[in-house]
């Protein structure tokens, strides 16, 4: 099966800043893809190239088999883009927003009204369809914005930080909408600053650092690269956590890690479940009581840290040094 997006040797500089440095990747069709990376890694630059908004200095980029440099208009007809901020008109109703977008796509009045009705249903916004958008919650606005990106029935939907700034409840609403869009046959590529979001939504994850791809695969494949499972324990207080870390360190298996905020301590378990009873025995001998203890897989956050040296929180809404000059954003 041909790649949905195929990049070869992409390079891009903004002044003295290198945004992309020999980036090569093939994004598979038929499964949602998440682009992860530290602040300034090149995520947004890459997404905007795929959207034909930025031209590469070097390299080739094909979307759906079409070269973005030679056939930008043909590429644009196959994609939808939802940026970091919801691009909706607050003084109009949700229905009016979608009808307006549909008319801009060239649909007649009757067809535009039908498109708006269909998308409002798909996004779960029927009850709020005739309310002004200024009365919507953040999650509702974001779902409306996602719906607007579907008006042209794109084969590929590009989502740049789709849940940034939303509360947990609104994030879950948007996650449900994204899952439904994917289930409906739309290919989705998203950038995100939330590792749990990538873990929940993506079947394929691409990690970018320093303007190039450093790892990719399914969440399980990436987690397996960290290596061993982890023995993790939770204590009642920080002092007990520190004592537990000393006990784990004395086992000589690996260096334990601690999280003061959650009072958790973990250690790599190369031997898997065989280490668990040894840890329990050592803690008991030292008189260290724990709230709970378990064997678990590495988290995506640990994968991210191992590969980039940054925690997930370092991946933010950076525009990757992209200038606002409209001439720089021209695709053709």
Regions found by a protein language model. Name each.
Residues 51:
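Helix-to-loop junction immediately C-terminal to a conserved catalytic motif
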Residues 59-70, 75:
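Conserved ABC transporter NBD signature motif
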Residues 99, 103, 110-128:
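Conserved ABC ATPase "signature" region
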Residues 157-160:
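Catalytic Walker B motif of ABC-type/P-loop ATPase nucleotide-binding domains
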Residues 175-270:
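ABC transporter nucleotide-binding domain
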């Amino acid at each position: 099966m041909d790649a949905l997006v195929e990049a070869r040797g992409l390079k891009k500089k903004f002044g003295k800043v290198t945004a992309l440095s020999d980036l090569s990747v093939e994004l598979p069709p038929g499964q949602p893809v998440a682009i992860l990376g530290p602040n300034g890694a090149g995520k947004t630059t890459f997404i905007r190239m795929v959207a034909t908004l930025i031209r590469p200095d070097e390299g080739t980029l094909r979307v759906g088999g079409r070269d973005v440099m030679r056939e930008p208009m043909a590429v644009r007809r196959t994609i939808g883009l939802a940026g970091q901020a919801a691009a909706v008109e607050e003084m109009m109703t949700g229905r009016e927003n979608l009808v307006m977008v549909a008319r801009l796509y060239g649909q007649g009045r009757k067809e535009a009204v039908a498109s708006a009705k269909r998308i409002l249903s798909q996004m779960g916004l029927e009850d709020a369809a005739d309310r002004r958008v200024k009365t919507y919650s953040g999650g509702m606005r974001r779902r409306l914005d996602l719906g607007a990106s579907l008006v042209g029935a794109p084969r590929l939907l590009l989502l740049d930080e789709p849940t940034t700034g939303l509360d947990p409840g609104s994030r879950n609403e948007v996650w449900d909408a994204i899952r439904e869009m994917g289930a409906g046959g739309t290919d989705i590529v998203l950038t995100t600053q939330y590792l749990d979001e990538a873990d929940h939504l993506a079947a394929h994850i691409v990690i970018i650092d320093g303007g190039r791809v450093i790892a990719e695969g399914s969440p399980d494949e990436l987690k397996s690269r960290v290596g061993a499972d982890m023995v993790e324990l939770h204590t009642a207080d920080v002092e007990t956590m520190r004592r537990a870390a000393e006990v784990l360190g004395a086992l000589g298996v690996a260096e334990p890690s601690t999280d003061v905020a959650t009072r958790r301590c973990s250690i790599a378990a190369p031997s898997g479940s065989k280490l668990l009873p040894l840890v329990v025995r050592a803690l008991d001998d030292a008189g260290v009581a724990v709230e709970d203890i378990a064997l678990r897989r590495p988290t995506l956050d640990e994968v991210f840290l191992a590969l980039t040296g940054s925690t997930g929180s370092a991946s933010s809404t950076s525009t990757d040094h992209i200038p606002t000059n409209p001439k720089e954003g021209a695709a053709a």
